[in-house]
Regions:
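Bacterial N-terminal signal peptides that target proteins for export
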Residues: 1-6
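Active-site acidic/histidine clusters and adjacent loop/turn architecture
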Residues: 30-96, 162-172, 176-178, 184, ...
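Extended, low-complexity, intrinsically disordered C-terminal regulatory tails
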Residues: 77-108, 186-216
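Catalytic cores and adjacent binding grooves of peptidoglycan-active enzymes
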Residues: 130-237
Length: 237
């Protein structure tokens, strides 16, 4: 009986903690103040947990931690980018990772993500030329995956980063950002992976567009940007 009561108490506490993120409604216009590294967010928009070709990567991050909020313009940008990818990347499922909290400010284990204009995107992965989703389903643990300098997964060398799909998605993000009054201000990807990315057809287009990739990173920052690419945006109007 005591064990049952304890379980019910834990479930109740979890539901209370998750409730604000379960029943949240988007409305109005967001206000982002400051920078991704030192800012805040008002009237945040909650990213969709699932669409026809995308999904938020972790229910714990989404419902309990609440790191699924962005500026209203970025919300529409991400939504539009995935819609474009329905055409440019047919059959591919994408995973969105951590964004900002409801009011911005410090986010656990992140130095930025503070004003609703940053988002992490999971690297798409392929095995024998086809998308593999096995490692997309491990939630927060995905941040701990390691890819070597050529984009091979340390746990399974047959699994590699799909740089072509990544490039198509970044192009879609750039297109959508411009339509929604934003511009991509910075992309962070493990330095050693950039050459393979820019050698692809779509990587070359990204370079032609002048989208800025971080040129140098501290060792600690560099090593954790292999399983995802971080994108900062800036308001332009």
């Amino acid at each position: 009986k005591k064990k049952t009561l304890l379980i019910l108490l834990i479930i109740t506490i979890l539901l209370i903690g998750c409730a604000p993120n379960i029943f949240y409604t988007n409305s109005g216009v967001s206000i982002s103040t400051g920078t991704p590294g030192n800012g805040s967010l008002e009237n945040a928009y909650q990213i969709n947990y699932k669409t026809n070709n995308s999904r938020y990567f972790s229910p714990i991050s989404y419902f309990l931690l609440g790191t699924c909020y962005v500026n209203s313009r970025l919300y529409q940008t991400i939504k539009d980018s995935y819609q474009e990818c329905v055409k440019t990347c047919p059959g591919i499922d994408f995973r969105l990772m951590e964004c900002s909290t409801k009011k911005g400010g410090k986010v656990l284990v992140h130095r930025t993500h503070r004003n609703g204009l940053s988002a992490d995107f999971m690297v798409p992965k392929i095995k024998k030329g086809k998308q593999i989703k096995l490692y997309d389903r491990i939630g927060l643990w995905h941040y701990l995956l390691n890819f070597d300098d050529s984009g091979e997964l340390s746990l399974n060398k047959k699994v590699t980063i799909d740089f072509d799909t990544m490039g198509k998605h970044l192009i879609a993000l750039d297109n959508a950002a411009k339509k929604n009054g934003l511009v991509i201000s910075k992309v962070i990807l493990k330095i050693e992976l950039k050459d393979d990315f820019f050698n692809t057809e779509y990587g070359k287009e990204i370079k032609r567009r002048g989208i800025y990739f971080a040129q140098s990173l501290s060792k600690s920052i560099n090593m954790v940007h292999d399983d995802h690419y971080h994108v900062d945006f800036k308001l332009i109007k």
